[in-house]
Structure formats: C-alpha cells, structure tokens
A protein has these predicted regions:
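A membrane-interface helix-boundary motif in multi-pass transporters
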Residues: 155-167, 213-216, 283, 404-453
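Intrinsic disorder in cytosolic terminal tails and internal cytosolic loops
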Residues: 1-3, 431-438, 466-470
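C-terminal membrane-cytosol helix-exit motif in multi-pass small-molecule transporters
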Residues: 168-186, 203-212, 223-236, 462-467
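Transmembrane-helix bundle of Major Facilitator Superfamily
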Residues: 1-179, 304-305, 312, 333
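Central mid-sequence intracellular linker of multi-pass
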Residues: 173-207, 245-247, 415-423
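12-transmembrane solute porter fold
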Residues: 6-27, 40, 137, 195, ...
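Helix-capping/helix-break motifs at membrane-protein junctions
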Residues: 124, 372-373, 416
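Hydrophobic/small/kink-forming positions within alpha-helical transmembrane segments
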Residues: 55-56, 86, 144, 201, ...
C-alpha cells in the first residue's frame, strides 16, 4: 500500500505539471500578447504549438512506454518537460516561445500516457478504480486550477513565472520516481509505427493551420493525411492506434464524448480570460480567481462521482454531466459589460464545474476499464489523451477563428483587419470608442459559448453508445 501511494503521488505530480501548463497560460495570454507584441493568431499558436506536438506524439509516447518501460519513459518526459519550461521562461519573442512550447509538448507526450498505464499495471483490480478516480480528480483539478495559479503568478511575479513553476514540480517528481517507484517491464515487443505517427502529426498540424490561417489547401492536406493514417493503421503489424480497440462500444462512445466535451471546454478556457481581463478589466489574479467555483466543485465532487460510477455504472453520469456542462456554457452568454461577478460569470462557471465533476472521473475509468488486454493500456490511455488534447487543439483554432470573424464583421469599416485580429486588444481609431470594441468582443464571445454549449450537449450522445452496467 505504501508503494502504491508513492506511485500515485509521482503520476499525479507529473501529469498535473503537464495539464496545468495546458491551461495556466490562458490567463497569461492577454499579458503575453501585449509584452511580446503578438496578435491573436500568434496567441493561438502559443497555446496550439504545445497541444499540436502533445496530440501528435502522445500515441508514440504510449507505445514507447509499452516497449521500453513505462516508468523509464515517464521519467524522461518529466525531465524534458522541466528543461523546456525553463526555455519558455527565457523566451523574448513570440516565435521563440512557440518553439519552446512545442518542446514542452514532446515532454508531455512522453509522460502523460505513461501515468495512467503505470497505475493500471501497479494497482490490483479491486483498488484500481479508486486509484484512477483519485488521479482523474487531482489532474482535472490541476487543469482548472491552472488559470487561478497563472493569474496570481502573472500579477505577483511575471508571466515568465507560469513556466518556472514547473521546475520544482519536475524535480520532486523525478526524486520520487528514482527512489520510490519500481521499474515495470516492457509489455509489448516490435517496432513503433513511425509512419502512422508522421501522418497523424501532418493531419493535425495541417488542420490547425487551416483553421487559424484560413487556408483551404491545408485542410485538404489534413484530410488526405488522416485517410492515409487510417489505411496504414489497418495494415501495419504494430499500429500506433490499434483500431481493434474501437470494436468496443464503450471505448468508442467514451472517446466521442471526450472529443466533443473537451473541445467545448478548451474554447471557454481560451476565450474567457480575454473577456475578463481586456473587456471586464479584471486583474490577472482576479481573472484566475474567477475560476475558483470550478476548482471547488471539481475537488469536492470528482471522487464522489467516480465512486458512484463504480456502483451504478458510468452511462447515466456520462449523459447527465455533459448536459449540465452545456447549461454552464449557455449561462456564460448572459454577461454583457460590467456588473457583479456573482450575477454575471459565477452562475455559468459553477454550473460548468458541476457538469464536469459529474463527468470526468467516470469517463477516465470507463476508458481504462473498457480494454480487456492490459498490454494495450498505454495505447488506450494515449488514444484518449490524444483525443482530449486534439479536441483542445482544433477547438482553439476553430473558435479563435470564429471569434475573429464575428468581431471583424461587427467592426467592418471601422477597424482594420490587422487590428481586428487582436480582438479586444484592438486599438480603436479616432472617432470610435473603446465601448464599440468591447461590444463586438462580447458578441463574438456569446456566439462561441452557444457553440460550446451545443458541443457539450452533443457529447452526451457518445455516452448513449456505452453499454449499460449489468
């Protein structure tokens, strides 16, 4: 039991570091945009460079862990992530920061799938569900606590501190792994499917570029690459995505839900800080604190929902949770400009937190327990995590482009396209008040939240595919 606690501590710390970094930067983005002179496209790439590399290589990371040892690959990922975080902190331009974020993505791709696979291998079946629920609750809390931590660090120290904070976490994680976590033997032999890895990287990268830069040709390349990826996976002996896993209705339904719900969540966490800081004039710390209701509900309810899923099965929870989350997104269309936080953003953020709390732990457990062959635990974890990060990657690209399009249309003839690309940071020309800029952003934000609500409700359809507990 003591050994299991150390294993759980190491996997939670390492995963939390990567997951925090996926969201901690969101509150820093408005400050980064000004400090580095970046437009919204570059701000999207600062987020998406990390998500693109993470999404593309996570499957390879899971497969690598299955072949050379999950603990070894996990530790390598933690070390690389820490080094890349230091590089991010030293960046003095948007392109350098984008490159450093991509390096962080490589480290995260190595450590993230290994964490759940280590838990699956180290815990006996009777304690595995509780361990996965604890991991899910803590890492989900880290994801949502990211904006809170980021806001405080940006205001109290510097935007660079949101990256430097990873260094002590990485060091502690490596110490635990070195002294307390036993090594696990490889579970799979054979070469890694680098052809499939290259094609999925091309597909995701081209799709992201197509959405952010409005390039139709890139979209066509993405489609061709994805079709090629599917064809290769059907033919190679050791595919990076064993398509046989999708014969499980439960595994397929859980991943459909993941794609849609995490896409909606990523859209909200990307755009909400711009609204709070640039339109509502919250300080970075106040903007981070605005997420506290989400943090509180995740910490209080996630373990409860995981235990409830063990008793009644996950299907009902995975239908109800996304619908409640959709209500939270819909409530975030209500705020205009000004007003008390408690009557504007609080109801939506709280409702969203309740919906995600109902969903996250049962969803993670469902994915990991739907695979009968434990040899592919790393691949299953990698697939689900890849889908979650790819959902965020594509959602930020799509919803960011949608926001700019609505914003630019509302300000057509008043603001240049170059200024419109900065969204709420756009400088109003002579004769145009800042209120006009803010009104246009609020309209764009509302359209995005309605779309996110639709995605969340649609994600409940994935849960309908999941088999009922007998």
């Amino acid at each position: 039991m003591k050994k299991e606690r150390w294993i759980l501590a190491a996997t939670i710390l390492g995963s939390a570091m990567a997951f925090i970094d996926g969201t901690v930067i969101n509150v820093a983005l408005p400050v980064l945009q000004k400090a580095l002179g970046a437009d919204v496209s570059q701000a999207q790439w600062i987020v998406d460079a990390y998500l693109l590399v993470l999404s593309s290589l996570m499957l390879a990371g899971g497969a690598l862990g299955d072949r050379i040892g999950r603990v070894t690959v996990f530790a390598a990922g933690v070390a690389l992530f820490g080094a890349a975080s230091a590089w991010c902190g030293f960046a003095n331009s948007a392109p350098i920061l984008i490159a450093a974020r991509a390096a962080q993505g490589v480290g995260a791709a190595l450590l993230t799938p290994g964490s759940l696979a280590i838990i699956t291998a180290a815990f006996p079946p009777e304690r595995r569900g509780k361990a996965i629920g604890t991991w899910s609750a803590m890492t989900s809390l880290a994801i949502i606590a990211g904006p809170l931590l980021g806001g405080w660090l940006v205001q109290a120290v510097s935007w660079r501190a949101v990256f430097y904070i990873n260094l002590p976490i990485a060091a502690v994680t490596l110490l635990i792994v070195w002294f307390k976590v036993p090594r696990l033997k490889p579970t799979v032999t054979g070469p890694i499917d680098w052809g499939g890895t290259a094609l999925i990287t091309l597909a995701l990268g081209a799709a992201t570029y197509a959405l952010i830069e409005s390039q139709l040709a890139a979209g066509a390349i993405a489609l061709v690459a994805f079709i090629g990826f599917i064809l290769i996976e059907r033919r190679v002996h050791d595919p990076i995505v064993p398509l046989s896993l999708f014969r499980s209705r439960t595994f397929t339904g859980a991943n459909i839900l993941t794609l849609l719900l995490y896409g909606a969540l990523s859209a909200a966490t990307f755009l909400l800080p711009f609204n709070l800081i640039q339109v509502q004039h919250y300080s970075p710390a106040m903007a981070g604190a605005a997420f506290l209701p989400f943090v509180a509900t995740m910490s209080l309810l996630s373990r409860w929902s995981g235990a409830l899923a063990d008793r009644i099965g996950p299907r009902l929870l995975l239908i109800v949770g996304p619908i409640v989350a959709g209500g939270g997104f819909a409530l975030m269309t209500r705020p205009g400009i000004g007003g008390s936080y408690w009557t504007t953003f609080f109801p939506g953020i709280l409702t969203l937190g309740i919906g995600m709390s109902i969903t996250v732990a049962p969803l993670t457990t469902t994915v990991m327990t739907s695979i009968e062959d434990e040899r592919y635990a790393g691949a299953a974890s990698g697939i689900n995590n890849t889908i979650a990060r790819a959902a965020g990657l594509l959602a930020i690209a799509f919803f960011g482009a949608l926001a700019v399009a609505v914003f630019a249309r509302d300000l057509a003839g008043r603001v240049s396209p170059q200024e419109a690309a900065k969204l709420a940071a756009a400088k109003p020309p002579p004769g145009v008040s800042k209120r006009v800029i803010d009104d246009a952003f609020v309209h764009a934000f509302r359209i995005n939240m309605l779309a996110a609500a639709g995605l969340a409700v649609a994600s409940a359809g994935g849960a309908a595919i999941i088999k009922k507990k007998k």
